[in-house]
């Protein structure tokens, strides 16, 4: 099955899964946890339909974006190749995020059902899964970024990286590596660190990867601009 078809299927799967799962949940379930895994909000089980609806909308939007990104009326073969490359990257992003949120939704439903019947409910498992998922997602997206070509839709996009094709190539190669490293460290944190720290570690590492990549993009921009003097 081609990536784009699987990605489309994946955007609808969370909705079907949730509709089935909700039949087995009590009417009132945990719907929110703080960063320590403690339940701080209860509500209707139908609240869990929000994420699948958002995923459906995002899936349709991203699918249309990928389709438009891969087609052009130009006869320039190089530009067409760049557009097709970016379309594949977008499809990969849709696939990766779809897998992440599908897994997250499944765990949220499982934890909600378990905690609704537990005398000492906890969201510790959910925190680890979120951190682990974010780490794996970062690794996957980090591998995709260097495959993108200069555009305004996907990749490490800022004014400095958009300066030239070379600035884009170098910035996205470095940014991809930074994401991979932060993702691997996040996975380790999700496995080894206390639950209360797992998501914080993921957020801190992602922020550091972004800051370092921005600094590198600025450096590359200056180097590229200096060549024109």
Predicted regions: what they are:
Residues 1-229:
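Feature 926 captures the class I aminoacyl-tRNA synthetase adenylation module centered on the KMSKS loop
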